[in-house]
Amino acid sequence: VVGAILLSYVAVFAFGVRTTVIGDSMSPTLVGGQEVLINRLVYNIFEPRMGDVIVFKPNGNENAHTYVKRVVATPGDKVRIMNGILYVNDAPEEFFTDSIANAGIASSEIKVGEDEYFVMGDNPNSSEDSRNANIGNIKKSTIMGKAWFHMAGGTEGLGRIR
């Protein structure tokens, strides 16, 4: 069993898709310059869930850099940011310890459409995400996969992304 696990990790490192986190929008979970491994198959079987860290190209723009953000709302959810607090389906969410300074387009209620996701950086006051009109809700077709493992960087060594 240990050999199979080791072999799978070697296969992922050798053949896995990597991307580099740009900026500090996912701090403290991930830091700028840190590399993450992407599971490209998981969303062919399952739907992204609230709390997943995903990798995507905004609006499907292949020339854009990859974005790494956390799913905070899924299809059918209603999202709004009021008084620095994220509300999903009228319930406050505790993803963020700091008050959210810029509500962006989420200052008014946003309905997340079918096959769409509302994403934010873990450091929302330094993040370009679904609150920005030029990004908005993320279509499932633009998601490259789930960021599941981070390389050494920041204060952490190798490890799973939570």
Where in this protein do the model-derived segments appear?
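Aromatic-capped interface at the extracytoplasmic side
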Residues: 8-26
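Soluble "head" domains of membrane/secretory-pathway proteins
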Residues: 17-20, 28-162
